[in-house]
Amino acid sequence: MKYSPILFISLALSGLYGQCDSAYTYYSQLPSNVTILIGDSCLYDEDITVLDSLIAINNLEYDSPLELGTQTWFNGRLRFLVAGNYGNSSGVNDTIFTLPNNIGNWTEMASLYLEWNRISQLPESFTEMAGLQSFYINNNVLVTLPDSIGTLESLYFLDLGYNQIESIPESICSLSALTYLWVFNNNLEQLPDCFCEMNMDWNDDDNGGYPFFA
C-alpha cells in the first residue's frame, strides 16, 4: 500500500503530539533561555498559563511565555525561574510590579528569583507553591508577607532583604526546613516571639559577611 507524503507527515505529527498527556502541550521549538533537565518538550499547561498571566498583568513585551526570564523545566513542570530585573538577558526585560493570583499553580516550582523589581505584596495563593525551596525577592518594595507563609514546608532559603517589611507573621516559625532568612534593611518594628526558637544561628553573618538584620 502506498501512502502520500501528506499522510506520512500527518502520521508523524500525530505520533509526536500524542506523546503529551492531556494537561500538557508539545513545543517543537524552545528559546535559548529554556532548559529541559529531564523529560521532553511536553510542558504543563497550568505552568504556561501563570507565565502568560505574569506577562499580561505587568504589560511585559514577550512573543511567547517561554521567553520570560531564564526557565528550567523538569518532567514537564517549571522548576526554576529567574525573573529578576537585572538589566541583562538572564532576567525580565522590564519591571514586574504585580504577581498574578494564579501563581499558586506553580506547585512544582523549586527556586524563584524576583530581585530588583517593584513588587509590593505577595498574593495569598503564593503559599500554595508547595514545592518552593528557595525564594529571592530582595530589592523590591514588599510591605507585608502572607499570614500563611508558614505552610511552605519545603522552603529553606528566603531572601527578603532591602524591602519595606514592617512585621513578619508568626507562622514563619513553622518553616522547619528554613536555614537561611535574610531580612537586612527593612522597616521591621517587631519580631514574632517564636523567632529565637527557630533552627538558625542569628549571631552569624551570611556567606557574604552581611548580618541577617540591620
Regions found by a protein language model. Give the residues of each.
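Sec-dependent N-terminal signal peptides
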Residues: 3-16
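N-terminal capping/linker segments that flank leucine-rich repeat
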Residues: 15-102, 197-199, 209-210
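Leucine-rich repeat
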Residues: 75-77, 89, 96-97, 105-109, 119-120, 127-132, 142-143, 150-155, ...
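Conserved hydrophobic beta-strand positions in leucine-rich repeat
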Residues: 79-84, 110-114, 133-137, 155-160, ...
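Consensus "Asn ladder" position of solenoid repeat domains
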Residues: 94, 117, 137-140, 160-163, ...
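Glycine-rich active-site/cofactor-binding loop and its immediate structural neighborhood
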Residues: 96-101, 105-108, 113-117
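The feature encodes a structural signal of leucine-rich repeats
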Residues: 99-104, 122-125, 145-148, 168-171, ...
